[in-house]
């Protein structure tokens, strides 16, 4: 008997060891799926991590707690070849180790659901029609047709089939004639015949039906490298500099201003990689971005391009996965965060566009990995594979690494076709509110700028980083605010459906007709979400063709495409949206962009608030002004004097970076220190408090003043669980493997206390 270590999709540390029956041993290898028993009645699909593994004298010596260990056997091997390549298994282990997450959680995040179940994936099949073999002679077929004179419809269908199959004359039919494959649906569409007519031809043994597997993936058109646009002088210089930097660096940062034409540089780099017979992974932070970029890449790379993200059906994702394992994989994969888990045989280039984006960081559930970091590690597993980070607003960590020489650095400071950067106009709404000159959240300057743009046949974008109709509703008599019963947050009002919802757990309730505290009916929304902005702007501009892009309006793949296509083609001319509209979308007719409230981002209680606000405002501003016209950005704020606001206006990333770097060094934050958050959750607040204090005390014994907390996070209760957070600030260069060891040891010591049996603990490494 041999033994194998198996990864199961369970949030438990380590592997499960199973016996491998001799009859299955030849089919077991690392990366194949196996069916295994667990407990008394459950069966799971696991992944073989190691085979064979040494078990010393399993029949005699394995004893735990006085009980002999018995090993269950694998039930079956589900694959003829591995569904995971060696590089993928290495990436799984790195993510599990670095982000302190059980490898079973990595399994759950990485594999499409259809591969996690023994019978989860069903290939799509279609019914085809063919002529019976004995009728593939002119005389035999003619006699058969003559005998069917009373079945005119059947004769019509048979003749239509022959025509579709490529037979122009009966004399052409021989047993060696190659007939075109015809689907039953195609034949029915051409002849308008019923299934009954075709079934009658089957009963006569004239036509034979057979089932054939057909893919769900669009085959696409052949690639057209000639569609690659030539680079201008600035782009060519940047392209050459990137190649030069890649000779001495595995990772290069392209810092290019908005609308500088970074995508065209990417396309040239992709083509170079393909010419060298290498594969390319192109990562984007938002699914919305893939809609626009897909069309550009398809025009060049055609059927060599595959797209992979969560809006595709599970069956489609399984088929892409299997295609990547085949001998004819996609050469270019365009995808969001989860695309890092796909198999690649010959990966040569990874492009991470908008590398600064928070969307690259997985939050819940585990593993809480950063796709940028994981993609860099993935590329390093392939010989000479390079990573290119691209953005107009680099993250502090990436720019610091580039400045320190760890990454290559290329700057692209000119916009494509020398389009001017937009004029950014600050509007002090604090003064306007005091003088009662605001119309809701809209300043007079905002309204006049939008009115003028629409009057010229141009488009405008309004940015408000909060979805829903209003952040909360409130009783104007007693101040009652409806809160989620399970979370420590107020409910958000959604007017279109007339309900209140919790954006943390999904709890919903109808808006009460009267206040439950004082019975007043004067219940109104407070604040402005995108839905309310849309409502009020329709009243002010009734002639405008308004679209809204937020999580509520883009829950399906087609919703993204429809909204973006409608705005691109002019069906809508005023787009209201949350942060997803800031992420690299290009619209030629947008001349005005409005940031409705910069302060809501700046005042968030997080050390990254200014960094994220600068990036968000700069990226949103970059949507204004494209071909032949300088754009205008209206930036509404109550704090126009803040340095970060002035830096956005001047498009002064260097000054922003320098100021923030000094602050980060002083207060021990990234890029000089690494952060690890330890979260504790429990239904009982006293229990989570005491557990947090005990764990914090044990960690302070090891890490001293590097430990902060436990504290309550901004939202201290979610889904009935009370939350506490402990922060570790660790110097760069510290032995991180020992840190993990100490963390786990301290936690194990705390969990020995029976009071903490139901305590949930997880880590967030490099949190955002």
Which residues does each predicted region cover?
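C-terminal structured "cap/appendage" subdomains that terminate the fold
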Residues: 695-735, 739-744
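Solvent-exposed residues in well-ordered beta-strands and their adjoining turns
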Residues: 9, 21, 681-683, 729-731
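Short amphipathic alpha-helical segments
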Residues: 14-16, 183, 674-676, 722-724
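Accessory, non-ATPase domains that flank or precede helicase/AAA+ motor cores in DNA-metabolism machines
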Residues: 1-391, 405-419, 702, 736-768
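A general secondary-structure junction signal
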Residues: 50-52, 111, 211-213, 464-466, ...
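Hydrophobic/aromatic-rich, well-ordered segments within soluble, folded domains that form packed cores
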Residues: 33-34, 91-94, 675-676, 680, ...
